[in-house]
C-alpha cells in the first residue's frame, strides 16, 4: 500500500563542516557528541573566549587544480565539491543523467562574503578604477549554486534562498515542490555558508556573538532528492522517504501554541527530532518534543544561516530503517518548518 513517503526519496548525502570533509567525520561527531568548534584567534576579535566552526580540513587542492580553485569564492568551493560528493553518494555518474531534468536549490546566508569585502574595499578606496570585474560574479548569494550547476552540468531548476536561519529549509521546501510537479527527476538541495574574520567582527558589533554564544560555523550539507520512480528505475540505493511538510509564518506573541499546533497537530509520532535555526528556543515546540530523542548540530559544528543543510544530513545519517523522523527549523521572525522523513526504502518498510 502506497504511503506519503513513496513519492520523493533521498538517495545521496554530502557534508563539509568543522567536523571534517565527508560523511564519516560528521557521523563520528554525532556519535561522540564532542564539539568540533575551535577558539577564535585573539587577533580576529581583539579578545579571547569566542569559538567558531571553521572547516579547517577542507582543501580545495584535494579536489581541483589550484588555478581552477582561484576563480571560486570559498562558499562556491564548498558547493562545487559537496555537489560532486552528493551525486557520487547517490550513484549518479558524470554524464550518466539527464542534465535538463536535474537541478539544484541551495540556501545561502552571505555568499562569497570575502570576495564581496575585497570588491567593495577596492571600490571605496579607489573608486570605479579599483573595481575588479573577476570578483563580482562571486559576490552574489546565488554564486555557489550557479557555480555548482556549471561544474556538474545541472541544467534543471536552479534557485538560491536567503531566509535567515531557514535558508536551507526554504530550498528543501521548494525542491520537493518542483519534484512533485514533475519539473525535474532529481534535485541537489541543502545549504552552504562560509565564515571569515570580517563576518565575526560584524557579528560582534551587532551583539550576535553573545546572543548565539555557541559559535558560528561554515560548510555545506547537501541531499540528493529524486522522484521515487526515477530512483528505482536506475536501481538507486534509497536512504529515506520524504513525507509531509508544513510551514507557518511569524508566531504571534501570545498565540505561539496555536502556531505550533498548526505546524504539528495530526502528524504521526516521530522517533527522532532534529532542530535547526532557533527552533530550540521556541518553548511550545520544545514542550511538544518531550521524551523524543533530539539532535542538534549547532553545538558540534557551529551555527550559520544555512545550517539546516548540515542538520538535515545529520538527521538522515541518524535515522534507522523504518523509523519516523521530524526536522524542525525556525527563524526569530519566521518562517517555521516541519519536515517528515522515514528511514530506508519506503517500499521495503
Which residues are covered by each model-predicted region?
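Structural signature of cysteine-dependent C-C bond-forming condensing enzymes
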Residues: 2-5, 89-107, 118-133, 154-157, ...
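Condensing-enzyme catalytic core mediating Claisen C-C bond formation in acyl metabolism
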Residues: 5-16, 23-24, 28-40, 204-277, ...
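Conserved beta-ketoacyl condensing-enzyme motif
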Residues: 9-10, 27, 31-147, 151-152, ...
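Cysteine-centered functional microenvironments
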Residues: 14, 62-71, 131, 155-171, ...
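Active-site-proximal alpha-helical scaffold in enzymes
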Residues: 79-92, 141-144, 149-152, 157-190, ...
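Short, well-ordered, mixed-charge alpha-helical segments that flank or form enzyme active sites
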Residues: 112-115, 169-171, 195-199, 251-252
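Short, surface-exposed, charged loop/turn segments at secondary-structure junctions
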Residues: 118-123, 200-209
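Glycine-rich anion/phosphate-binding loop at the beta-strand->alpha-helix junction
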Residues: 185-186, 191-196, 200-205
Amino acid at each position: 500500500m502506497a504511503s506519503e513517503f513513496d513519492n520523493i526519496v533521498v538517495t545521496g548525502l554530502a557534508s563539509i563542516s568543522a567536523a571534517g570533509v565527508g560523511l564519516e567525520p560528521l557521523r563520528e561527531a554525532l556519535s561522540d557528541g564532542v564539539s568540533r568548534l575551535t577558539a577564535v584567534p585573539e587577533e580576529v576579535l581583539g579578545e579571547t573566549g569566542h569559538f567558531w566552526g571553521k572547516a579547517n580540513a577542507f582543501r580545495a587542492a584535494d579536489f581541483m587544480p589550484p588555478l581552477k580553485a582561484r576563480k571560486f569564492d570559498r562558499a562556491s568551493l564548498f558547493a562545487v565539491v559537496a555537489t560532486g560528493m552528493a551525486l557520487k553518494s547517490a550513484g549518479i555518474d558524470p554524464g550518466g543523467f539527464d542534465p535538463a531534468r536535474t537541478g539544484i536549490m541551495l540556501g545561502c546566508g552571505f555568499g562569497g562574503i570575502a570576495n564581496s569585502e575585497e570588491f567593495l574595499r577596492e571600490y571605496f578606496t579607489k573608486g570605479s578604477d579599483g573595481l575588479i570585474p573577476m570578483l563580482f560574479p562571486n559576490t552574489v548569494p546565488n554564486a555557489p549554486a550557479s557555480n555548482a550547476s556549471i561544474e556538474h552540468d545541472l541544467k534543471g531548476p536552479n534557485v538560491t534562498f536567503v531566509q535567515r536561519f531557514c535558508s536551507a529549509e526554504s530550498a528543501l521546501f521548494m525542491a520537493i515542490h518542483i519534484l512533485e510537479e514533475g519539473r525535474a527527476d532529481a534535485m541537489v538541495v541543502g545549504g552552504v555558508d562560509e565564515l571569515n574574520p570580517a563576518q565575526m567582527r560584524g557579528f560582534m558589533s551587532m551583539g550576535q556573538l553573545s546572543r548565539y554564544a555557541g559559535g558560528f560555523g561554515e560548510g555545506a550539507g547537501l541531499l540528493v532528492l529524486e522522484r521515487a520512480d526515477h530512483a528505482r528505475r536506475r536501481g538507486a540505493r534509497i536512504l529515506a522517504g520524504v513525507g509531509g511538510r508544513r510551514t507557518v509564518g511569524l508566531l504571534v506573541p501570545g498565540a505561539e501554541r496555536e502556531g505550533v499546533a498548526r505546524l504539528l497537530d495530526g502528524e504521526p509520532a516521530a522517533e527522532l527530532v532534529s532542530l535547526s535555526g532557533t527552533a530550540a528556543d521556541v518553548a511550545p515546540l520544545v514542550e511538544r518534543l518531550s521524551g523524543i530523542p533530539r539532535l542538534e548540530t549547532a553545538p558540534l559544528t557551529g551555527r550559520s544561516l544555512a545550517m539546516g543543510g548540515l542538520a538535515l544530513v545529520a538527521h538522515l545519517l541518524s535515522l534507522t530503517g523504518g523509523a519516523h523522523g521530524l526536522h524542525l527549523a525556525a527563524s526569530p521572525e519566521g518562517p517555521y518548518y516541519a519536515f517528515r522523513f522515514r528511514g530506508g526504502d519506503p517500499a521495503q518498510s
